Amino acid sequence: MNICIVVGARANFIKVAPIIRAIAKAHEEGRDISYKLVFTGKEDDKTIEDSLFDDLQINRPDFYLGVDCDNLNELTGLVMSKFELYLQHNPTDTVIVVDDLASTMAAAIVTKKQGIRLAHIAAGTRSFDITMPKEINRLVIDGLSDILFTAGISNNNIANKEGAELNKVYMVGNILIDNLRYNHSRLKRPAVLDKLGLEEQKYIVFTLNRKALIGDEAHLEKLIKAMVRGMKDSTMPIIASLRGKAAKVVADIVASTSFPSIMKIIEPQ
């Protein structure tokens, strides 16, 4: 069986790592199974540094579609055309997609149009806000998928209510937990704790990945202020693990408030 695993962002690699390791193990045991890892972005994407793959103990992608643009509709079209070419030149039995990105939806559409079996990891996730682009992506991907892997009973119920056949839905739990279990013995105290003089369990980790929030600084500022007001200890350090535009937006907000003394922006570790 030839499996193609499609990822569209850094976080996707973390979710597919356990699957890649399971496929590799099955292959070593003599089973007729192999995989190709396809990244929809560029090879020089700064968010997927070598240390990411070292930490996850998986290889870098086998193929890069090279798509990089901010307009989601344009991105969708480019991924569709380039992924179609990939499938035409690489025999594939099953395509696995993860989460709810525009690139994920694009790959899902092409897969079904090519008559290839489609599996979706993190299926049945809903915000019930159809104005969110990702909610549209989720509905499309789940609607097209032949196999839906869900994280819990509530996700199963959503998939079933939306018409998914029972024999297509598999509750496999939160796949991120597999990574924690796999890496538990290798986990070390992050060097950044010592660098910033932090004590264990006495700091807050803050991250941000919603484009809608990044683009609405006024709303984001309200959320950050609400977070600080809700803290039991107003002096507790907040570690913001951010890069790129998200880091700049948060830095600008912090600079205009009284938070600089407690909020520290660092590169994702």
Question: Model segments located where?
Answer:
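Active-site and donor-binding regions of nucleotide-sugar-utilizing enzymes
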Residues: 4-7, 14-22, 28, 52, ...
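A short, Lys/Arg-enriched amphipathic alpha-helix followed by its capping loop at the start of a domain
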Residues: 19-33, 229-234
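Short internal beta-strands
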Residues: 35-42, 237-243
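Generic beta-sheet signal
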Residues: 38, 121, 151, 172, ...
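N-terminal beta-loop-helix "entrance" segment that forms/cooperates
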Residues: 42-59
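A nucleotide-sugar donor-handling region in carbohydrate enzymes
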Residues: 43, 47, 66, 144-219
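Donor-nucleotide binding loops and adjacent catalytic segments primarily
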Residues: 50, 188-269
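Short, conserved active-site loop motifs that form the nucleotide-linked donor/cofactor pocket
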Residues: 62, 169, 262-264
